[in-house]
Amino acid sequence: MNNVGRPTRPEAANDAANGHETLTGARGLLQDEALIFELDGWNKTGVDLPPVTAAPSSDLNGLLRDAPIGLPGLSEPETVRHYVRLSQKNHAIDLALYPLGSCTMKHNPRLNEKMARLPGFSDIHPLQPQSTVQGALELMDRLAHWLKTLTGMPAVALTPKAGAHGELCGLLAIRAAHEAAGNGHRKTVLAPTSAHGTNPATAAFVGYTVVEIAQTEDGRVDLADLESKLGDHVAAIMVTNPNTCGLFERDVVEIARLTHAAGAYFYCDGANFNAIVGRVRPGDLGVDAMHINLHKTFSTPHGGGGPGAGPVVLSEALAPFAPTPWLTHGDNGFELAEHAGDDDAKTAFGRMSAFHGQMGMYVRAYAYMLSHGADGLRQVAEDAVLNANYIKAQLKDVMSPAFPEGPCMHEALFDDSWLEGTGVTTLDFAKAMIDEGFHPMTMYFPLVVHGAMLIEPTETESKHELDRFIAALRALAGAAKAGDTERFKGAPFHAPLRRLDETQAARKPRLRWKPVAAAPLAAE
């Protein structure tokens, strides 16, 4: 426990009985780390500031702060140690395989980081004259060329900052195209039952009604159900390919034909592009818009190492409706056209973000493309699919593949039928994986598979690491079937924090730290 009674480490059940309970609460290098606010101390800041003799005048009146806001004061070494110790409590791709399905948690090459830190990219500002950032603009142009070439699409919007933001961009372009054609009455978007949750959420955000398309027993779009729901009220269909069951939509060309025949557009969720990059061009399949997660397929960092980036490629029909700015190349070099009036052929719906997108991610993704080349990117897809099928093949006798017939694509999907009668749930199994040193796979998604366990190893894992992961899962599966429920119900035992009480977390959430009431500032 820390000084406010919050559990900060696992309780070692046998430590006290064996005389191994430590006096401080720490366990070797597993430090008992408090919140940074709890480390606060008077006059501990690492910077000396000159005294203020008189407060500057202010027009804030009643808004002027009259009490401290509770920011912690720490010295520089205390601050550094705090965050380093916290980092040691987290799993990361730099520690072990990170099998989150539909997330493509591949290695982030250090060469990319070196390139992104070149002063010509890292020290520029989006408001400085464009004549002084020609190198950065040229890199954006080259990245756009690669994205268009790999997808077979004629246009790309670089500025969307994540996958869902890319979905928003694509649907706004689709809405603008329909309105320009006098088809503003089309207010429905179709999406499969296995779709990413962001698909219906984005469609609803744009103002569309979402209608689900049924899935066949083999995990793919039901063409008959799709055809029955198409009509002049439908604006678009949103399909992930490969889909979230880890399967390629074999009827994708027919899906596109039916959609276009009904006057609608085909939006492809490109979250799983890593499985087909260099092998399949979505534009050749009839796709009208697709976002590409640079932080998945093209290895730019996830999460705290981010930010994300989700450029959107567009078909010839949607290209005129791409958001500003547009990158052009003329007598004065590369320029960003900021207004729709700058090009009479375009009728943009506006901007997707301030400035020009995630420049650091552009550099990393472009470095990744250059280091692989076209043949290397093709091998990326092949190895990603190979690794997923190796896991599926090695686990199919102890776990239950959701779709056992035929190969999967980049991720292997299992259901929980193999756990029936064991008293162990998908959640229990995932928590036990933490004790074995692995981040859990994606759980309970897609929703169409009961107790889903979605495993995506990516192409950057060696056979040795895959075998280590497989051995851990086989051992856990054996323990579950042998009735060792205690191993699972209490897991994780060896993580910095134990399992939360989910009922209390839902009913009485503590979402922010609340400081002790501060005394008013002393008047001068």
Curated annotation (Swiss-Prot):
Highest taxon, organism lineage: Bacteria
TM spans (from-to): none
Catalytic activity field: N(6)-[(R)-lipoyl]-L-lysyl-[glycine-cleavage complex H protein] + glycine + H(+) = N(6)-[(R)-S(8)-aminomethyldihydrolipoyl]-L-lysyl-[glycine-cleavage complex H protein] + CO2
GO cellular component, one term: glycine cleavage complex
Pfam family, one: GcvP2_C
Cofactor: pyridoxal 5'-phosphate
EC nos: 1.4.4.2
Class in the EC hierarchy, top level: oxidoreductase
NCBIfam families per record: PRK04366.1
Protein name in the entry: Probable glycine dehydrogenase (decarboxylating) subunit 2
Organism of provenance: Caulobacter vibrioides (strain ATCC 19089 / CIP 103742 / CB 15)
Organism lineage string: Bacteria, Pseudomonadati, Pseudomonadota, Alphaproteobacteria, Caulobacterales
